[in-house]
Amino acid sequence: MKLYTHKINRIVDGYLDNLNKFGLNYMFEQDLIKITLDLGIPNNNIKFYNLNNSNSNSNNNNNNNNNNNNNNNNNNNNNNNNNNNNSNNSNNINNKNDILYNIIIEEKIDLIIFYKSIFSENANNISKTFNNLTTIIINDNIISNTNNNNNNNNKFYEINYPFKISTLLSGYISGLISETNIIGYLKTNKIQDQTLLDTFYFGARLSNPMVKLMFYTIDYDFKNASNNNFPFQEIIELSVSSLLKNGVDLISSSFENNEYLTFCNILLKQNIKIIGSNGFLISPPLNKDHVLFNSVYNLTLYILPIISNLINNTNTNNNNNTNNNESTNSQFNINLIFNPSISNLIINNINSNLSMIENQILNDTNIILTNQLNNESIIDLGIISGYILFKPISKTIEYGITIVSSILIGALIIIQICIIKYKNKPSFKSASPTFLIFIVIGGIFVYIGVIIWVSGVNVFTCNAKFWLISLGLTTMIGGIVVKNFRIWLIFDNPKLYHIKITNLQLLPWVLGMFLLNVFLLSLITGLGKLTPFKVFPNDEKFSSYEIQCEMMDGGLIALYFLLGYFAIIVMIGIFVSWKIRIVDIEEFNESKSVAYSLYSIVFCLLIIAPLTISKTGHNTEILCSGFIFIVAAIITIMFIPKFWALKIYGAEGSNEIFRQSSSSTSKRKNKSSTTNDPTNLDSISKKSSKNAPKRVNLFLYDFTDDDEESKQSSSSSKGDTIECMDVFTFIESVQPNSEAANEMTYNDDPTYTEPSEQPTYTESSEQPNPTPRTLTATPRTNDLTTPRTNDLTTPRTNDLITPRTNDLSTPRTNDLNTPRTDGILTPRSINSLATPRVEEPMSPRQYHNMMITLSPILEEENIVVVEKDEVIENSDSESESSDSNSDSIIQ
């Protein structure tokens, strides 16, 4: 006797901890081999075949039987009869060209078993074609029996498998064990799976009326895998993860065979217990550790009488069996195997209610369908299709971001050229051209990173975008902070200390920021292991997905440190911008520009930081747009004012110091000749009108790239300061009756008049300020050198024209080289006041600039002078007080 069995899929070895073959098919194979051996049928007479394969699967044995037992004599007679009948129908078989028919003829099959109800039509046709062939079909359709009522062959058998009992038991036990009172279920889109879902939930409600059910429907094409763009394993992982997020602690399914194996494997990875059902045989090691219970059915107990009758050549009428309802537990010998973690109280509860559960199954009207329940008790989470729509970045957005970034890169290159061209102009030199170049280079890095970001998702782009954007922002922010930190140190200097900070001294700070950023990015790359992964904008529906970069937990920690690092740099920059608000020179005061730039960065970082960590959809477009805005805002805020100032003020700048600085080179060349020639009134006038205070000289030579240039600029600036002081010394040391004093009068000036023997004074109101002053007989009013009296009309006596005494080392003469004569030591006479002092007339603009430039430095000294003047007016020693006042002004 030869048996032929049909099944859909075979089970492979090696699943789940050296798990043996399991599943309904394999269980039936083992049981069938066992009972046939007991009946004396050799194993090589049993053949298992997969209908989905074109060739027979010789999983077990060859078809040739060389050694027949004595018990097979009757079988041989039956085989001969079958062969005769089959030969009579050979013409009909050849016309059908059915591989099943060929196998039956070639292998001389006596009995064929179909495992699935979907092949009921094949079983019915074969039974009608081969009248002497015993045909058995196991009906796994829990809705109804197979439509084989018109089959008159008395060797056709139908066995109804009790799926409902197993499913109801799974639901009953799940309701007892669940701690959250929320259970999950996964089913396919088959009609019978909906019935299994109803049965599962009905069993759970029998044991726990408060339980809730959440389920997904998996719409997967198992026959044509090419119709699916998503692997079945990933779909199960998505659905299981979503159920766990909703508070589910137990999950069951209607999957079978390989699909059930995949489902169990995923549950084990999530550390979720497996609910065995549907007769799956699981090895004891797995059962003890991971499976809550098994319900195993021995189908061969019902098949055994059929095979025995076939061996004994006894025909049994199966009409009563064909239309039978599902067999009960006693007929299939159900065995429940529980996990040791389940308490004895639950086990006793199940065993005591097992008969009640069977009676509920036999009466289908007691089962409540899911569509009859309210939404509070059962929740349909939707359908997960095997073909999930992939939504990449829109081509319009990709092209738009790429084009905009490319245009901005071109604009930055043009700005870079302008910086190099106009680096010596006040608007750019005052802003440190070296660091302006760093800012522009950083912006180019960011835009290149944005272009790579939207070009696609792979391992390279996931890492490159982090490196380029992060290093670009560090270079930009570092350049802004460091260059303004120097301005703060120079201008926030009340005591006017000499501070020299060159670009070479600042570059290590920018380099340090850059290297620290490289270190953090290395940690992100090494620990994060950025790889592409699929993101679902709608976590519950899973209708579409995007591909983004996934980062491991170690990389996320380094990313948090990187974001904190940027926050610290930005806060320092905001503080520095607040400190340099005191600078009253437009080219140096970038407080508003820096503040606005950093505020825009803070605003965008508050949006970018959460999106960088999250896995939501469409964050690529938001992040790229944010980075484009940050760089564009910084470049616009920092450079538009500089180009505007270049257009308005040109090469001279907005302040007198830049005009002085531009002409200081030519003045230094003629320094020796002009300072040694007191008769050169023009050079003396220019020196005396120099409006550069010490505060200006502190930063005129500080914005250089090397120490040598800084030293040269420093010495020249100091020379200018000494040069200005020499003018004061020369004017104050000229004697009233000397030739030098007489030469200082403007003889060619038509407004000049010779003084009389006695000076004639006019009221201060007759010569309004700032009328050009001349040292005629008319005294000066409201000036630091004008003789003061109580009513401001009486001329000051013994004023600054009184010669200095022995406190000066060498007395000056007309040419400033001859020692002073003895006449210097004689006291001043009244007539000496008649000799006028002459200064070069000053225009209102020059006088205004001089007063504004000197006022920050001399403000405190003027107060001291006024106080001293009041004391001098009541003092008897007017000569000594005048010398003290002149010395304080010169200092």
From Swiss-Prot:
GO molecular function, one term: G protein-coupled receptor activity
UniProtKB keywords: G-protein coupled receptor, Glycoprotein, Membrane, Receptor, Transducer, Transmembrane, Transmembrane helix
Transmembrane annotation, as ranges: 400-420, 434-454, 462-482, 506-526, 556-576, 593-613, 626-646
Region (Disordered): 52-91, 660-689, 742-827, 869-891
Compositional bias annotation for Acidic residues: 872-881
Domain of life: Eukaryota
Residue positions with a glycan: 52, 85, 88, 125, 132, 224, 298, 312, 320, 325, 353, 363, 375
Biased composition (Low complexity): 772-782, 882-891
Listed GO biological process terms: G protein-coupled receptor signaling pathway
Stretches in topological domain Extracellular: 1-399, 455-461, 527-555, 614-625
Compartments where found: Membrane
Chief location category: membrane
Pfam families xrefs: 7tm_3 (PF00003)
GO cellular component labels: extracellular matrix; plasma membrane
Residue stretches of biased makeup (Polar residues): 742-767, 783-820
Family, similarity comment: Belongs to the G-protein coupled receptor 3 family. GABA-B receptor subfamily.
The protein's name: Metabotropic glutamate receptor-like protein N
Species per Swiss-Prot/TrEMBL record: Dictyostelium discoideum (Social amoeba)
Gene name per UniProt: grlN
